């Protein structure tokens, strides 16, 4: 066996292992999607909205929350104002005149989203807390579906789905990336090692949040979702996932590539603080695999000669490429279908995955060296 064949075989084995894992994720997504909810009609719930500026987006979200089908008397909504420079207080106060369950909570101590969430949890009247970003949109059945999911699958932390909407090349990349990340969220949860969460749609029990210390001691500004997940895991708390149609929230993609890059630098910075060696190693292999396939393909084209196991090398190499990309495209398509989006576009998904393999390692490195500004503040 020549060195060419041996390397191609090694790459195929790794790709096949990744394909098996991704196919297992597809099965997990199907099982989670098939689960039903319980009767949450009498479950009280607090919806927590930390906000800094973005009054127009907040107004749209509050309209969605006001239209919820869950009993209004059981649905408390708290808007925690993180020192906004826009008229957030005026907006909330005007709506609260006709909506007594809506509360405005200005932050008196500290700053940042984590401090805002902790202030909101302290003020919450109910045990079940639903966290949502101020720029998210949701369907009228969202709150009721969250309550039903907690009834059917009792847990301390509930991971919920987020769909990104966007136009143009940059928007398309973000849409596909978010779908792939949601697949990874459900997949790693099914493996017993959940790594991802999204603060735009997250629910937890107030007593569990307080028991793990909330965000006490966290020095990073971002990462409220992932750090809470890691704290819950370390404390042995129960983590569940639900993806029912009514649970989805929609967020707009960053309008420009520059803003999308800044957003990803912020996200990558928080992932560097996650302490899970096994999952980290597997993620590193998954990130580097397409690079290894690309480098070996280029070398094979440039240097391999007839007689060096040419046929076997290229058979294994093509199989490795297929084992890497086909399951990823399929699982991303599964998420698109769950989100009720238009018919999945495998070519578009494949192109976005290729782009992700190029920019993800670069962002991971740059995020260690550079902290972007977010909402007027330098991220720590």
Label each residue range with its predicted role.
Residues 129:
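Short aromatic/hydrophobic "clamp" motif used to bind/position activated sugar donors
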Residues 86-87, 134-149:
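Acidic donor-binding/catalytic loop of UDP-sugar-dependent glycosyltransferases
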Residues 63-74:
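Short, acidic, metal-binding catalytic loop of nucleotide-sugar glycosyltransferases
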Residues 7, 23, 282-370:
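Membrane-embedded multi-pass helical conduit in multi-pass membrane proteins
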Residues 150-153, 157-182, 210, 216-279:
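Catalytic donor/gating beta->alpha subdomain of glycosyltransferases that bind UDP-sugars
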Residues 107-124, 145:
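Glycine-rich, basic loop-to-helix element that forms the pyrophosphate-binding segment
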Residues 78-91, 109, 136:
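A conserved acidic beta->alpha catalytic loop
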Residues 1-39, 184, 353:
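N-terminal membrane-anchoring/stem segments of glycan-assembly enzymes
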């Amino acid at each position: 066996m020549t060195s060419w064949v041996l390397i191609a075989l090694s790459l195929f084995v790794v790709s096949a292992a990744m394909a098996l894992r991704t196919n297992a994720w597809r099965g997990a997504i199907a099982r989670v999607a098939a689960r039903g909810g319980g009767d949450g009609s009498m479950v009280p719930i607090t919806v927590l909205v930390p906000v800094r500026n973005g009054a127009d987006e907040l107004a749209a979200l509050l309209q969605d929350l006001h239209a919820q089908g869950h009993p209004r008397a059981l649905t408390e909504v708290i808007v925690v104002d993180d020192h906004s420079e826009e008229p957030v207080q005026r907006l909330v106060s005007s709506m609260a005149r006709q909506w007594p369950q809506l509360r405005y909570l200005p932050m008196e101590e500290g700053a940042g989203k984590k401090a805002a969430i902790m202030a909101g949890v302290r003020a919450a009247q109910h045990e079940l807390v639903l966290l949502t970003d101020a720029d998210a949109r949701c369907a009228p059945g969202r709150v009721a579906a969250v309550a039903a999911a907690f009834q059917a699958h009792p847990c301390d932390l509930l991971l919920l789905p987020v769909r990104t909407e966007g136009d143009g090349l940059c928007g398309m990349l973000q849409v596909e990336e978010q779908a792939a990340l949601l697949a990874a969220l459900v997949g790693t949860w099914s493996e017993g090692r959940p790594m991802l969460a999204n603060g735009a749609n997250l629910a937890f029990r107030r007593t569990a949040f307080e028991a793990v210390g909330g965000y006490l001691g966290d020095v990073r500004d971002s990462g409220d979702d992932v750090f809470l997940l890691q704290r819950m895991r370390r404390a042995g708390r129960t983590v569940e996932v639900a993806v029912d149609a009514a649970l989805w929230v929609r967020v707009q993609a960053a309008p420009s590539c520059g803003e999308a890059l800044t957003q990803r630098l912020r996200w990558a910075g928080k992932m560097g603080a996650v302490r899970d060696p096994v999952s980290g190693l597997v993620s590193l292999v998954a990130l580097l695999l397409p690079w290894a396939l690309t480098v070996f393909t280029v070398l094979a084209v440039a240097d391999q000669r007839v007689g060096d196991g040419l046929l076997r090398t290229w058979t294994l190499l093509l199989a490795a490429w297929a084992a890497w990309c086909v399951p990823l495209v399929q699982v991303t398509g599964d998420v698109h279908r769950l989100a009720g989006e238009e018919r999945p576009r495998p070519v578009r998904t494949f192109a976005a995955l290729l782009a992700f393999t190029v920019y993800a390692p670069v962002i991971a490195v740059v995020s260690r060296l550079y902290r972007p500004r977010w909402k007027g503040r330098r991220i720590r």
